[in-house]
Amino acid sequence: MIIGITGGIASGKSTVVKVIRKAGYQVIDADQVVHDLQEKGGRLYEALREAFGNQILKADGELDRTKLSEMLFSNPDNMATSSAIQNQIIKEELAAKRDHLAQSQAIFFMDIPILMELGYQDWFDAIWLVYVDAQTQLQRLMARNRLDKGKARQRIASQLPIEEKKPYASLVIDNSGDIAALIKQVQSALLSLANPR
């Protein structure tokens, strides 16, 4: 069984993943896969450098993720170019990791922030959506990424609204409360997995 984990930016997916890993389950982290591919010499690094030039690199030749983010979120054409380049490479890499893990794990998870936006729904037997109300999401994103309200709203707007993701979810984990309530929901869901009725 493969379970997809998704949710809006700053919704609390990382905390959910920590609880799942602590329970002994494997989780493929799409953001980490992307990060690895963007390392100097990686497939995405080379593809992005070819598309946007050396202006997206730091002095030491590493990818300047902050500069790249600013370029993408401020310009829809740049975002479209980047998405077209990256999505295929990322999909290939995630599929390889999924297929490898499926050989040894009966149940595992894949944390993909923009799962619905990229059309990954068919990969999963179940999808867990981490939900947070819009105001809380905005405040958390501003605090976490040190963004002003305008930039935070811009990032949130680049993703499918959470309400449009809900119909795809087999489980909605509500993270509008405190961390203890979030952990309890995840532990309960994991218990149901281990002991299906």
Swiss-Prot record:
It holds the Pfam family CoaE. InterPro entries: Depp_CoAkinase, P-loop_NTPase. Gene3D superfamilies: P-loop containing nucleotide triphosphate hydrolases. It comes from the Bacteria. The keyword Cytoplasm applies. ATP binds at residues 10-15. One of its GO terms (molecular function) is dephospho-CoA kinase activity. Its EC number is 2.7.1.24. It is an enzyme of class 2 (transferase). One of its GO terms (cellular component) is cytoplasm. Residues 2-197 form the DPCK domain. Keywords: ATP-binding, Coenzyme A biosynthesis, Cytoplasm, Kinase, Nucleotide-binding, Transferase. Pathway: Cofactor biosynthesis; coenzyme A biosynthesis; CoA from (R)-pantothenate: step 5/5. Its main location: cytoplasm. It is found in: Cytoplasm. Catalyzes the phosphorylation of the 3'-hydroxyl group of dephosphocoenzyme A to form coenzyme A. Belongs to the CoaE family. This is Dephospho-CoA kinase. It comes from Streptococcus pyogenes serotype M28 (strain MGAS6180). The gene is coaE.
